């Protein structure tokens, strides 16, 4: 079969392919996409072209306006991959009211150039003023802020916005008010040390870091499953243990910086909206670039949110009004650090190096337990009360007793680890500044450039290979029998626990029969 003759595609046609794929209730196969495109646009496509269009490097198409979308690829500049990345950078920076000057564009172009594999053996272009003017005409959106223009938040406007948000919140029952936030978590952080970092193709990133997305309602009665974003598509520790994230009650995503991106946030919002099926809920978010871009993509699509109303907190208000940004994230990290400290102490007692034996699967297990088991609804409810989001409710001051208790417990464990020989600020261990840095222009460049990093097989290169015995159904049944025997021999056995074990035993026995 002769190869397909290359046909120039407009950005609008590429955008249509992405829209049809990502907004379809049932994701079409690439062959189905090719047939659909030929039927609607009378052009033939190669499968490799479809794969490229659906990849993250073409995310910028989702926000492209109608006028610019008629530009054909062969009318782009000499370096289309770079220009697509620059459009992505520009969109993210504008969301933060950042000043996009000509010098900023040229500087970011040079930074991105060094990180794009296709250009690795080519000299860096001059990026002259002539190139800049042509690039602006070709690609930049109308309404671009140039020459240092940026918007600032007026205090009066800020207070008016909060009054309007409080009025909106008052229309919802507390059980239908949700807050979502993400936080970095350096899962091998050692007391009195900074997170270990590495430099990969010009990008500096923490070695053992994930981003954890947490979401809960105001009463604490509902905690959504965690979303964890790492570096590897399928970490080696997961494969060795044959661990399946869905079975563990969490969702795993990945990218080159282990941070929230527009595409992951858009996926999360649609997942959350499906989770709220049959309800009308309010979702409170902070004004983070990925949040805003994702919501804008959804609002401009045919498949909009049905069950969820989204409201953004004013800029620079998260320290005051953000429940998850206050004690909820702090408590979550405190619970996690407790498991990690206990693990370190035990490994050292056994003569092992915890930094080598630790892996991301163990970390995720502790995250899930911290969130699903250790977290009491009262902690979350009190955090919402302390936030001042509710009308006629003065924000409470000072940490809650539970948060203080967790910190005291951690301080005792740290004393055992350090041997009380060092002065130690516990805040630097529970919630280090490196995990919560704001997005600077360098951060945004890193996030855009991350799409060009090679896929990883592991989360850190320090992990020792760990042999895992794959359990059979018979092994699981035997383990349940052991637990049932333990319950029978306990004077204070838990009847509800016994019933749960019997139900699980029945399910496993039905599997073994099949």
UniProtKB/Swiss-Prot annotation:
InterPro entries noted in UniProt: CenT-Element_Derived, DDE_SF_endonuclease_dom, Homeodomain-like_sf, HTH_ABP1_N, HTH_CenpB_DNA-bd_dom
Domain DDE-1: 172-384
GO annotations of cellular component type: chromosome, centromeric region; nucleus
Pfam families from the UniProt entry: DDE_1 (PF03184), HTH_ABP1_N (PF18107), HTH_Tnp_Tc5 (PF03221)
Purpose of the protein: Binds to the central core and core-associated repeat regions of centromeric heterochromatin.
Localisation: Nucleus; Chromosome, Centromere
Source organism (scientific name): Schizosaccharomyces pombe (strain 972 / ATCC 24843)
Protein name from the UniProt record: CENP-B homolog protein 2
Keyword DNA-binding in record: yes
Gene Ontology MF terms: DNA binding
Domain annotation HTH CENPB-type: ranges: 70-145
Assigned keywords, A-Z: Centromere, Chromosome, DNA-binding, Nucleus
Domain of life: Eukaryota
């Amino acid at each position: 079969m002769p190869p397909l003759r290359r046909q120039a595609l407009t950005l609008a046609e590429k955008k249509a392919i992405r829209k049809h794929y990502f907004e379809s209730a049932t994701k079409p196969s690439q062959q189905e996409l090719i047939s659909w495109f030929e039927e609607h646009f009378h052009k033939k496509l190669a499968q490799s072209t479809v794969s490229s269009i659906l990849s993250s490097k073409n995310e910028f198409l989702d926000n492209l306006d109608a006028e610019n979308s008629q530009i054909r690829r062969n009318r782009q500049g000499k370096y289309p991959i770079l220009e697509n990345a620059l459009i992505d950078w520009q969109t993210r920076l504008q969301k933060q009211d950042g000043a996009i000057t000509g010098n900023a564009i040229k500087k970011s172009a040079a930074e991105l150039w060094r990180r794009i594999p296709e250009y690795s053996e080519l000299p860096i272009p001059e990026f002259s003023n002539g190139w800049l003017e042509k690039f602006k005409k070709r690609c930049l959106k109308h309404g671009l802020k140039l020459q240092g223009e940026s918007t600032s938040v007026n205090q009066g406007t800020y207070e008016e916005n909060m009054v309007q948000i409080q009025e909106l919140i008052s229309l919802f029952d507390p059980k239908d008010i949700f807050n979502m936030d993400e936080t970095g978590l350096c899962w091998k952080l050692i007391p009195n040390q900074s997170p270990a970092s590495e430099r990969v193709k010009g990008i500096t990133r923490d070695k053992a870091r994930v981003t954890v997305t947490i979401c809960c309602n105001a009463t604490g009665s509902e905690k959504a499953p965690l979303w964890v974003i790492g570096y590897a598509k399928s970490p080696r520790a997961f494969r060795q243990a044959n661990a399946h994230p869905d079975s563990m009650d969490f969702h795993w995503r990945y990218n080159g910086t282990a941070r929230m991106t527009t595409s992951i946030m858009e996926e999360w919002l649609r997942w959350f909206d499906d989770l709220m099926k049959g309800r009308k809920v309010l979702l409170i978010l902070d004004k983070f670039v990925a949040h805003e871009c994702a919501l804008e993509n959804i609002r401009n699509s045919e498949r909009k949110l049905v069950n969820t109303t989204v409201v953004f907190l004013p800029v620079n208000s998260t320290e005051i009004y953000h429940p998850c940004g206050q004690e909820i994230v702090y408590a979550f990290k405190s619970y996690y650090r407790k498991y990690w400290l206990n693990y370190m102490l035990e490994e050292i007692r056994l003569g092992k190096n915890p930094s080598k034996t630790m892996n991301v699967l163990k970390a995720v297990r502790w995250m899930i337990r911290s969130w699903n088991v250790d977290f009491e609804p009262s902690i979350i409810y009190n955090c919402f009360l302390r936030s001042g989001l509710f009308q006629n409710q003065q924000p409470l001051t000072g940490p809650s007793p539970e948060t203080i208790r967790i910190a005291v417990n951690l301080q005792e464990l740290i004393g055992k680890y350090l041997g009380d020989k060092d002065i130690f600020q516990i805040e630097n261990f529970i919630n280090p500044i490196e995990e919560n840095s704001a997005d600077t222009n360098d951060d945004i460049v890193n996030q855009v450039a991350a799409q060009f990093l090679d896929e990883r097989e592991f989360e850190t290169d320090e992990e020792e290979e760990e042999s895992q015995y794959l359990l059979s159904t018979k092994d699981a049944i035997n383990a349940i029998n052991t637990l049932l025997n333990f319950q029978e021999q306990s004077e204070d056995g838990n009847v509800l626990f016994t019933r749960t074990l019997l139900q699980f035993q029945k399910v496993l026995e039905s599997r073994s029969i099949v």
